[in-house]
């Protein structure tokens, strides 16, 4: 943690130091629960992605505002036992936090695109050519393996969420570029990482100026939990106390 201004800043490496956890094996629920316990109110995801569009070359950043979730082997909700909740994911990112990200990126004159759709694939393999062309036909912008179910779980925990995706390669659809390989990704990723560090520093310095007190994420559980109170056992309420205690303990 690093103390800045009104609160602390925490960094969480999804894949662990040295990148030894595959996307499918990331414990997204534990990560979000731990951040909520620490008092985190906002998450900015920074991740490597492949590009699905000609005008999003390697090195460019995308401030994502929509997702297509193609994952199938991950725990996607905190509310999977006795207590059921249906949070809205129509707008999965927080506009104020996106504005803060954009200002931090612009300050360093990093090439970027505001708004974009991120296809989240299960992995760990890269796409087939047929899959890549399918996602392009959906008008998606980038493809990666990490933002889902992270964004959904952050919403369930009432944590505002933004995603900054760093393009490392053209996915295999591009006829004039080699098929994706790890060495190619790492080479571009190292350059992107330096830009991301500066962006994050700028973000830490100014993000609180952009937070919307009326962001629907702040109290989304008020209208999401559908299970009748008499069906909620104390054991399950206690299990959910970190992410949902605000509403379950009323």
Task: List the model feature ranges, each with a label.
Residues 172-219:
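His/Asp/Glu-rich mid-to-C-terminal helical/loop segments that flank catalytic regions of hydrolases
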Residues 221-250:
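Acidic, Ser/Thr-rich low-complexity intrinsically disordered segments
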Residues 1-6, 10:
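Single conserved hydrophobic/aromatic residue that forms the stacking wall/gate
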Residues 11-24, 116, 134-137:
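Short, basic, glycine/proline-bearing loop/turn elements
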Residues 51-130:
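Mid-sequence, gly/pro-rich, charge-dense loop/helix-turn segments that line enzyme active sites
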Residues 22-44:
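Glycine-rich anion/phosphate-binding loops
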Residues 36-39, 136, 155:
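Non-catalytic positions within long, well-ordered alpha-helices that form the structural scaffold/packing
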Residues 145-182:
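Zn-dependent metallopeptidase/amidohydrolase metal-coordination segment
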């Amino acid at each position: 943690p690093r103390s800045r201004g009104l609160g602390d800043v925490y960094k969480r490496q999804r894949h662990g130091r040295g990148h030894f956890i595959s996307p499918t094996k990331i414990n997204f629920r534990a990560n979000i629960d731990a951040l909520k316990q620490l008092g985190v109110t906002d998450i900015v995801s920074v991740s490597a992605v492949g590009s699905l569009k000609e005008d999003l070359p390697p090195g460019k950043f995308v401030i994502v505002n929509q997702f297509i979730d193609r994952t199938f082997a991950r725990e996607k909700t905190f509310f999977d036992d006795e207590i059921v909740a249906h949070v809205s994911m129509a707008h999965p990112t927080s506009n104020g936090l996106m504005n803060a990200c954009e200002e931090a990126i612009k300050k360093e004159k990093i090439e970027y695109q505001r708004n974009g759709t991120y296809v989240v694939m299960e992995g760990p393999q890269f796409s087939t050519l047929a899959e890549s062309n399918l996602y392009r036909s959906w008008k998606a912008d980038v493809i990666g393996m990490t933002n889902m179910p992270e964004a959904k779980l952050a919403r369930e925990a009432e944590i505002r969420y933004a995603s900054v995706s760093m393009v490392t390669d053209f996915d295999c659809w591009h006829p004039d570029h080699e098929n994706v390989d790890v060495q190619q990704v790492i080479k571009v990723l190292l350059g992107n990482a330096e830009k991301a560090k500066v962006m994050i520093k700028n973000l830490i310095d100014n993000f609180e100026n952009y937070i919307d007190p009326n962001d629907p994420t702040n109290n989304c559980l008020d209208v999401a939990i559908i299970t009748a109170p008499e069906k909620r056992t104390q054991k399950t309420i206690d299990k959910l106390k970190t992410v949902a205690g605000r509403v379950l303990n009323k």
